[in-house]
Amino acid sequence: MALDIHAHRILILDFGSQYTQLIARRVREIGVYCELHPFDMDDEAIREFNPRGIILAGGPESVHEANSPRAPQAVFDLNVPLLGICYGMQTMAEQLGGKVEGSDLREFGYARVDVVGKSRLLDGIEDHVDGDGVLGLDVWMSHGDKVTQMPGNFNILASTPSCPIAGMFDDARGYYGVQFHPEVTHTKQGGRILSRFVQDICGCEALWTPSNIVEDAIAQVRQQVGSANVLLGLSGGVDSSVVAALLHRAIGDQLTCVFVDNGLLRLHEGDQVMAMFKENMGVKVIRADAEKQFLDNLEGEADPEKKRKIIGRTFIDVFDAEASKLDNIQFLAQGTIYPDVIESAGAKSGKAHVIKSHHNVGGLPEEMNLKLVEPLRELFKDEVRKIGLELGLPYDMVYRHPFPGPGLGVRILGEVKKEYADILRRADHIFIEELRKADWYHKTSQAFVVFQPVKSVGVVGDGRRYAWVVALRAVETVDFMTARWAHLPYDLLETVSGRIINEIDGISRVTYDVSSKPPATIEWE
């Protein structure tokens, strides 16, 4: 009988915290499957999900305000272990008969909590011990309210001077609440705390591993697709590359990929994609050389959003044209990943603040009467990368820096021209090459060059040169929501600048972008 890697599962209910997806990623890193659902998930759905444990995540609301969110009753009726984090602890306390009040002293940022009670959750977990033998944890707090009275049968787990009940527990039921955030890296022992809850208290085994995920995905694809043929738009990005490798292993020649070369890719990227998938792996790949079509459609357009829409529409036109030449295609594969699924669900429920639109396939499924196959839809981005390595894709491909869907089209400020794209891709190649040589590529989260359509005077030999300006951009970030500019060594910047100006005709000046996000975005357009 095949291993059911979803058998041991954790349910995470989202009350609106910015950290909720991070909780899910931490649970997955432990090797346990989990799903994230809105706080108002109905009782029947919770019972059908049949979790081994439930985590109530944080949120921005106050439990003593009217209409603030509450956990469904099924959470308490299932008799499974429960962990409330921040707001999750507060609503658990209030719903079970305790009291929550606003605090005069809010806690935001680093804090030290004293471990007061002896519980299964924190037994043997500490950062330091003071002279009186009191155990302490270094944690990350983010709360304005606090529990002032615990429900019956609960004991104090942890405390701070301004928040005497910074944690509470009922070992008999496996109910725990912590006012701090174990999911963030600032809480040093957070990983151990979550592992203790998920594995030891909930009894979940580590079945969610890259090798098991690959085997399960292959079995699911074969069951869904059977002997039918599948079409995939291959971009060379991480998600579509992993889908291609996974589907090829699962169904072989039943997969056909269409690679649209829009003339806005990185240096040699089209050839590299073809070499990797067609020549090395034997995947059926059709290369559509559409540079002229994209550049013609972009001619005269300088507005960033309009450029994006033109590139998106042109991609669909080219992809449609290639797909219409193929016979007997029943399925369209997509690189949908779990955050896309979460956002879509949030959009439908009206709870999402940000809605991402995916234009990569347009109306193709409906027009061609195709069914969707989405083998990555349960996975976070970091899991997709691990799956890529498990499937044998090169590390440098799997851990390549993000590249925008419109490509160089949004790294050329203003109108896009072939001359600009050719200059930019060479400059970008030099920057990335030198980052790799200096062992800085993987220390940065994203690095690239921006073409600015302004000219600056320069001196070459005995003559003056009036040529274009480019900007180097390199950032460090954990989640791409915030980012700081990378403090690259001056000698590295000097080497990059010297090579770009000396090796590329048409560039007279190189600048370095020292803007962080916020207020600046990572990309310039």
UniProtKB/Swiss-Prot annotation:
The active site is at residues 86, 181, 183. ATP binds at residues 235-241. Pathway: Purine metabolism; GMP biosynthesis; GMP from XMP (L-Gln route): step 1/1. Residues 9-207 form the Glutamine amidotransferase type-1 domain. Residues 208-400 form the GMPS ATP-PPase domain. Gene3D superfamilies: 3.30.300.10, 3.40.50.880, HUPs. GO terms for molecular function: ATP binding; GMP synthase activity. Catalyzes the synthesis of GMP from XMP. This is GMP synthase [glutamine-hydrolyzing]. The gene is guaA.
